[in-house]
Amino acid sequence: MSEAFDLAVVGAGTAGLPAAMAAAARGLKVVVLEKSGRIGGTLHYSSGQMSAAGTQLQRARGIEDSPDLHYADVMRISRGLANGPLVRRAVDLAPRTIDWLMEIGFEMHPSCPAILHLHEAYAIARTYWGVDGGRSILKAVAPVFEAARARHGIDLRLGTATTRILPGEGVMARRPDGTEARIAARATILATGGYGANPGMFARLHAGMPLYTTASPTSDGSGHAMAEALGATLRNMHFWKPALAGIEDPAGSGRVAWEDVPALTPQVRQPWEIFVDAGGRRFVAEDHESVDIREAALARLPGLAFWVVFDEEILREAPPLLPRFDRARLEAAFAGHPHFVRADGVEALCARTGIDADGLR
């Protein structure tokens, strides 16, 4: 007989860990199934940015804010398209979450709370992140999770990939040795993350759009696929925008490191360069204060691709476009990476990149 649980949590990341702890604290017998060999999920890869209004940190810095103001700001930024009840729930619980993280030793970046312009900005400083991105969250939460495992008997199974949901009965899972097992559970929580590492699913759900991603390799859409197999409908797939911008590295991998994203935020670094499409035309004002407008312009381009064009003087005099690239790394990129192109003049540059020379002149 297989052991029976009250709850199976699929995924030991940002959502799965607190879900398991909360359920176990309420007396439920919990098993956590994680297909990778470690807990944390996307926290190993993400910048870990969070927002909350009415936190102790805000009060300590004299920032007047509230969940009501946070809610209004979200609805403003989303142009009223966000799910109101879900937003309400999130903003009401967010300050408690930030305060809890601080209590358990989260190492907050000293600039926080802040107004962050990498996304469409809030009107009030209510964005937070750790000194080491998402890893700062994991560093604080992991010991608390381990303590909860010891206290409540949470069964953590690493290297165990859930393959099928059995409604009301549990799940089927593949063990590290490749064998299949039925894990009995009265309820299941899917905390598998997104599908940002699954180009095929991304193309299916987003009209064939290409995928260049910073996502964790475990964000493969397996939870979505298991839910769809049961008849679930995926909604709001049209609500997405590309980030501006990233460098595929290595070329052909579809992977982008968020730490290497170019400094294209005008509130942080005013642009010296021009952004052009394949026709050589500037498709957006490079210094437009709204990232929403800039990303919407990018979304209209074929292949979601554009060129950042500059000359040697700009390279020499401007603040670094790629802050983590020293001169040696930049030279290596121009020498061997297909997304870095150098030429002696406009005609030669266009010949090498395929940019229309008449448009660029």
Model-flagged regions — what are they?
Residues 158-169:
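A conserved short coil-to-beta-strand element within the FAD-binding core of flavoproteins
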